[in-house]
């Protein structure tokens, strides 16, 4: 075989990326380390027809784009004179970086207290730290500007420095008269009045021009922000693009050919609504959106210690609870209550025969997601860490707040007292008492119903009966073997041999022992049973095959319903504030309660005495965070960015919402209409905002003399909308104001599931134990179970058809992650994931070019095309339809056919003897392999990996 020359210009001219891909299959791996080859790979991944490129960005940004982004990210001009105050603008910076040494401790570094302007002016050991109006004369500014303070590598940002310098220059103003003692005011009015802590209020719908009267509420709010900035909506995405987008968004799968043709044939005004209704009714909706929730829940099927990452074999029951809840459109308020306190919704004792009881207990698996290594390393510190991680998961997923900072001291950024943290912890401590701890194995709940137990017992009896029959026949056969060996001895010793072998070993005489040593093949029946392979290998194999029937019978058993859940012991649990977060140093006792900053805006409607009270308090419709946070999460997964871009941090250190009125309107609307998430999805995906194009279509141009502001609300002004897209791209490069759709890369699971779908392999069955992932001999995570022989690795038993199940159903063990999923940013749950990365890195391209699983899927797809169409043009058309939900352009068709033929030609010339023999038997094999090359190139393209 010819070697692939990575640096040869002639080589790269002769061979496209597909040739390199397929050559690598035959040569084990092509040499792809040279920069030139890597550049070729990255460029060729998206080489299918620039003419068909609908605004799809390639891996590298253009210099103009980079310049635009830098301009947008640059620090704004100095604030207007007198506009800065200490409490609002400066104190948060100093609190984050300086208060630990200069304020919070009884002994302050340099005797300098930075918590009050008055004390900065008074100064410390080095004199006055602040001279209002004169930054150059202010010691605090000099230390910051010279990078002397704060100590360590983390310094103030340029923007923070600008704020402090401008504030001093403006006179070091305060918002109000300062208190005499800074300890009296642990948080300011500005911190307590942060937007996210204020109650949700339903805003009025913005006014729009007469031409925009058709706009839905979402679009009115978006239009209002666009109009303020002289921007407008972009053109609508074409129907195929919209269908692919919404199908992936709601189910995580590509649309089928039938779904595409049905939608294109439906010319009614309700065509899109019918599509959305169908997708929301699909069981695959629950699979897709469960993945998003499981990210924030920190879902994992192992305990988390690297060396002893013990599996959680029953955790999949919680995963199935989430899928079922979402498919059933369980109202979000109920969803939260069940996960926080489902066990308390049951009248004791729980009845295993009541499926509702089992479901409610399974829901509390939410509180069992945090790492817990106490099974093998049960220390107070590890117990405490599990509780802390659980609290972090609860607060970030439901409240959108990071409370962990308040374990040791008042929160660095948000108005959360250390006492607040331990009050919140006291809500959950009865199920996780660190001084009455139960290890993971001691917290399993068996909810197996009587019918299942009876069925299991009957099947076990059947298996035992068959096993006994096999054992009896095997012993009879071994008795025959024993007698054969005795008969092979001289007649004079046969009876003594029989007497010796029937005598228990400890009772044998020396003469009997000597006799048996002379005839080593004469053994007890038990010995021969164990060593039958040495006496009669054929019989040994026959009995092994019969025992497979026993295993098959046992495989019919319905599964025990064992749940990883929580429950309260009933014993009182006292909670304390830990000094500096140390569980060995408990301080003042505390009772369960809400964060004080939230209570300051509205008191709980009833006392919070435990988990159920707290869960009901969160979901009573008046909480300022719960509805906002879930609305933002749903928006995030439809647009690639939330209205708040820090979905797990709605606090002062997070970003403010780009569209606060829209966020509040949607949050209020969610509560008003019963917390139904499917209704929220409909509102979003049927909006004009969601339906915009992500880029200009081929041949689009901006008409001369037209601007985006001519008629920004008009649904028919396509030329104007195209101009609006350019306006939005140039003036809003981050798409904060939603003047176009954001291009989004598919996440890891959607990529794998889509490859399985288009190659006609996907198994869409729901529920059940996770498909095993194991470490092979090379240390790589693969689908299947390890097979051991005498304690040593003997291979991987594949998962069969289950290997093609959706990625949600693969084992989620922390230390074993499939290479494909990990390469495309499958998150680590430490302790959970608020926002996934969407990286673009070289290993992704190399994996899609060389991974054996991807190559096999490409071949499976080629076989599907081969049987699905006869003409080459139709096969290429079907490939594009499956991969991109659209037919190829004329140029793409020509390029693809030519590429396919070049690939087939190359395969016809391979000299490998086995391959030559296959070609003689199957003359079309080379063409099929060439088609597989084309399929792999489509899979590796940006158009497949991204949603437009």
Feature map (PLM): residue ranges:
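Intrinsic-disorder-associated, low-complexity terminal segments enriched in Asp/Asn/His/Tyr and depleted
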Residues: 2-10, 46, 69, 711
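Short, low-complexity, charge-dense intrinsically disordered segments
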Residues: 3-19, 24-27
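Bacterial N-terminal signal peptides
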Residues: 32-47
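Solvent-exposed helix-loop boundary motif
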Residues: 43, 59-165, 174-224, 240, ...
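Active-site histidine-acidic residue metal-binding/catalytic motifs
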Residues: 59-63, 68, 149, 195, ...
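Short, well-ordered beta-strand segments
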Residues: 166-171, 774-775
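Primarily short, surface-exposed interaction patches in extracytoplasmic proteins
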Residues: 209-284, 299-352, 414-415, 458, ...
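Globin-like tetrapyrrole-binding proteins
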Residues: 934
């Amino acid at each position: 075989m010819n070697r692939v020359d990575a640096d040869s210009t002639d080589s790269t001219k002769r061979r496209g990326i597909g040739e390199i891909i397929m050559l690598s299959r035959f040569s084990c791996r092509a040499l792809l380390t040279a920069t030139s080859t890597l550049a070729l790979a990255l460029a060729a991944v998206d080489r299918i027809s620039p003419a068909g490129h609908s605004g799809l960005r390639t891996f590298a940004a253009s210099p103009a784009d980079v310049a635009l982004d830098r301009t947008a990210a640059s620090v704004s001009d100095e604030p207007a004179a007198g506009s800065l105050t200490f409490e609002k603008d400066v104190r948060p910076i100093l609190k984050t970086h300086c208060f630990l040494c200069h304020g919070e401790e009884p002994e302050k570094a340099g005797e300098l207290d930075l918590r009050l302007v008055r004390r900065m002016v008074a100064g410390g050991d080095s004199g006055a730290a602040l001279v209002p109006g004169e930054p150059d004369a202010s010691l605090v500014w000099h230390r910051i500007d010279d990078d002397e303070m704060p100590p360590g590598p983390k310094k103030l940002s340029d923007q923070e420095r600008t704020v402090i310098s401008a504030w001093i220059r403006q006179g070091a103003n305060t918002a109000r008269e300062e208190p005499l003692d800074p300890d009296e005011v642990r948080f300011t009015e500005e911190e307590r009045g942060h937007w996210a802590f204020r109650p949700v209020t339903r805003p009025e719908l913005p006014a729009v021009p007469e031409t925009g009267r058709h706009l839905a509420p979402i679009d009115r709010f978006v239009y209002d922000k666009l109009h303020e900035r002289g921007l407008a909506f972009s053109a609508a995405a074409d129907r195929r693009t919209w269908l692919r987008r919404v199908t992936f968004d709601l189910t995580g799968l590509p649309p089928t050919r039938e779904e595409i043709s049905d939608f294109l044939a439906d010319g009614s005004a309700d065509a899109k609504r019918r599509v959305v209704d169908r997708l929301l009714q699909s069981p695959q909706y629950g699979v897709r959106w469960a993945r998003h929730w499981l990210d924030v829940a920190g879902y994992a099927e192992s305990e988390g210690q690297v060396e002893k990452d013990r599996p959680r074999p029953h955790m999949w029951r919680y995963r199935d609870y989430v899928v079922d809840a979402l498919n059933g459109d369980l109202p979000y308020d109920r969803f939260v209550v069940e996960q926080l306190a489902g066990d308390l919704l049951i009248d004791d004792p729980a009845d295993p025969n009541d499926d509702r009881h089992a479901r409610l207990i399974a829901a509390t698996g939410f509180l069992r997601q945090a790492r817990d290594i106490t099974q093998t390393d049960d220390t107070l510190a590890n117990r405490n860490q599990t509780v802390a991680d659980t609290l972090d998961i609860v607060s970030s997923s439901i409240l959108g707040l990071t409370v962990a900072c308040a374990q040791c001291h008042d929160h660095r950024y948000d108005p959360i007292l250390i006492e607040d943290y331990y009050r919140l912890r006291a809500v959950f401590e009865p199920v996780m008492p660190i001084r009455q701890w139960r290890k993971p194995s001691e917290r399993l709940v068996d909810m197996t119903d009587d019918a299942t137990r009876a069925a299991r017992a009957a099947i076990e009896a059947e298996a035992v009966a068959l096993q006994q029959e096999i054992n009896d026949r095997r012993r009879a056969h071994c008795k025959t073997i024993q007698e054969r060996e005795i008969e092979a001895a001289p007649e004079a010793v046969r009876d003594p041999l029989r007497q010796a072998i029937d005598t228990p070993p400890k009772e044998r005489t020396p003469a009997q022992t000597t006799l048996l040593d002379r005839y080593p093949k004469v053994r007890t029946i038990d010995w021969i049973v164990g060593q039958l392979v040495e006496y009669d290998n054929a019989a040994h194999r026959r009995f092994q095959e019969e025992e497979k029937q026993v295993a098959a019978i046992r495989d019919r058993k319905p599964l025990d319903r064992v749940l990883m859940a929580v429950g309260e012991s009933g014993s009182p649990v006292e909670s304390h504030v830990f000094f500096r977060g140390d569980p060995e140093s408990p301080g003042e006792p505390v009772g369960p309660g809400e964060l004080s900053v939230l209570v300051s805006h509205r008191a709980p409607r009833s006392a919070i005495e435990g988990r159920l009270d707290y869960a009901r308090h969160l979901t009573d419709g008046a909480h300022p965070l719960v509805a906002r946070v879930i609305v933002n999460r749903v928006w995030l997964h439809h647009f690639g960015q939330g209205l708040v871009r820090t979905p797990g941090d709605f606090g002062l250190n997070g970003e403010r919402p780009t569209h606060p009125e829209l966020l509040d309107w949607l949050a209020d609307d969610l509560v008003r209409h019963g917390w139904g998430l499917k209704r929220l999805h409909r509102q979003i995906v049927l909006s004009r905002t969601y339906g915009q194009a992500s880029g200009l279509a081929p041949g689009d141009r901006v008409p001369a003399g037209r601007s985006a502001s001519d008629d920004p609300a008009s649904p028919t002004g396509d030329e104007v909308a195209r101009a609006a897209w350019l306006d939005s791209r140039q003036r809003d490069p981050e798409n904060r104001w939603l003047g176009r759709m954001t291009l989004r890369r598919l996440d890891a699971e959607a990529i794998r599931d889509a490859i399985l779908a288009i190659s006609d392999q996907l198994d869409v069955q729901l529920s059940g134990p996770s498909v095993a992932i194991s470490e092979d001999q090379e240390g790589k995570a693969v689908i299947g179970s390890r097979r051991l022989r005498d304690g040593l690795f003997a291979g991987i038993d594949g998962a069969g058809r289950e290997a093609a199940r959706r990625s949600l159903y693969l084992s989620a063990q922390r230390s074993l992650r499939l290479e494909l999923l990990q390469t495309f940013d499958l998150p680590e749950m430490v302790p959970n994931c608020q926002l996934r990365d969407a990286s673009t890195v070289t290993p992704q391209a190399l994996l899609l070019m060389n991974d054996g699983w991807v190559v096999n899927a490409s071949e499976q797809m080629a076989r599907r095309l081969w049987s699905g169409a006869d003409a080459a043009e139709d096969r290429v058309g079907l490939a594009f339809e499956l991969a991109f939900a659209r037919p190829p352009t004329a140029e793409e068709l020509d390029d693809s056919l030519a590429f396919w033929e070049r690939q087939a030609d190359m395969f016809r010339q391979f000299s490998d003897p086995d391959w030559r023999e296959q070609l003689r038997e199957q003359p079309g094999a080379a063409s099929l392999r060439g088609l597989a090359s084309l399929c792999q190139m489509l899979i590796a393209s940006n158009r497949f990996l991204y949603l437009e």
